[in-house]
Structures are given as C-alpha cells and as structure tokens.
Design a protein with these regions (language model features):
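A cross-family kinase active-site recognition segment
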Residues: 1-49, 53-55, 84-86, 156
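Active-site activation/catalytic loop segments of kinase-like enzymes and analogous catalytic loops
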Residues: 89-121, 133-150
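Hydrophobic/aromatic-rich alpha-helical bundle segments in the mid-to-C-terminal region
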Residues: 16-19, 143-161
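Active-site acidic catalytic loop and adjacent metal/ATP-binding pocket
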Residues: 44-90
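Non-catalytic, C-terminal membrane-associated alpha-helical segments of glycosyltransferases
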Residues: 132-141, 157-161, 165
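Regulatory N- and C-terminal appendages and interdomain linkers associated
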Residues: 166-173
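Glycine-rich, phosphate-binding/catalytic loops in enzymes
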Residues: 76, 93-95, 156
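A general structural signal marking secondary-structure boundaries and capping sites
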Residues: 8-15, 50, 103, 119, ...
Length: 173
C-alpha cells in the first residue's frame, strides 16, 4: 500500500487545491480518552495554520477499503472523488489513522516507514498529527457498519490505539 501511494504522489498533475477537512475550533479529546494530555498536546500543535513544505497529487481517502486486491497483490485504487493537490502527509496520515483504529500503532508506523523508504521523503510529523486528529467519536459508529462483520473489530480499543499513535508522532517532533 505504501509503495502504491509513493507512486501516486510522484505523479505531476494539476487538480483542485487542498482544503483541510479538520475544523480546529471543534477539536477536543474524545469522550472515552484515557490520555487527554496526549490529545491536548496534539491539538495545541496544530492550532496554527501551516503551509506545506511539499505538495503533490492526493487521493484524499487513501485506505485499504479503497484498494483492489488480487491474490494478495494491490492491483488498483478506487474512489477518487476527493482527489486534489496538497501535502502528501494527508494521504499518509489518513491511511495511518485507518490502520491504527483497525489494527495498531505499530502497523501504522510500519506503513509510514515503508512510505518514507519508497518515496524518499520523510513524513512531516505536524501534518501527520493534523490528519490523525480527524479521528472522533463517529469512527466508532461508522466503522462497524463499513466492516459489516467481515473482520474482527475492537471498537472499544480504537481511542486507546489512537492515543498510542499520536504519542509516537509527538515524540518524533
């Protein structure tokens, strides 16, 4: 997945400009947070607008639900309705968010490391935090519907896994 994303980000295309989906004025630790301090630190970090140091063509909803697989090989990426030009960390962070809530912070960090190796670019921790903060209470409601029993899902552990990945990113600063 990280290799495909590096290839997408290498495309030289013009498209609509990036607009953040994150409403900073509405950010707060999730109600079930056990580490509100981690959330507050992450929220404080992204309080000010930041200009990306690098932009590229983005999928904008890059995650395994939008990938086509054949014999354990990634063969395509679907759902390009939100594609735009913006910081590559938005795609990386969105995929990492999904990998974290569904699996673990370790899996999300492995994805980032492979992406960095494949793309030749280090993921800016600020943009990573910015995108990871898209997580909220609605994730525990819509993911079970999206998964629809096709795989095990630990809804109660999602926020804790997000706290772990945020803490790991904040240590990278």
């Amino acid at each position: 997945m990280a290799q495909m994303l590096a290839r997408i980000h290498a495309l030289d295309l013009d498209d609509k400009p990036f607009e953040s989906w994150l409403d900073r004025s509405q950010l707060s630790p999730p109600p079930d947070a056990s580490r509100a301090d981690v959330w507050r630190e992450a929220i404080a970090l992204v309080a000010e607008e930041r200009v990306p140091t690098r932009t590229c063509f983005l999928h904008r909803d890059y995650q395994h639900f939008n990938m086509l697989w054949s014999r354990e090989r990634l063969t395509g990426v679907v759902d390009w309705s939100e594609a735009c030009i913006g910081p590559p960390e938005v795609d990386v962070g969105h995929c990492r968010l999904n990998l974290t809530v569904l699996f673990s912070a370790v899996v999300a960090d492995r994805f980032r490391a492979i992406y960095e190796a494949e793309s030749g670019h280090r993921v800016d921790a600020w943009w990573d935090v910015h995108t990871l903060l898209s997580y909220g209470p609605s994730w525990t409601q819509f993911l079970p519907i999206q998964i629809d029993g096709r795989a095990p899902l630990d809804v109660e552990g999602m926020t804790g896994r997000m706290e772990e990945v945020l803490e790991r990113v904040l240590r990278r600063l």
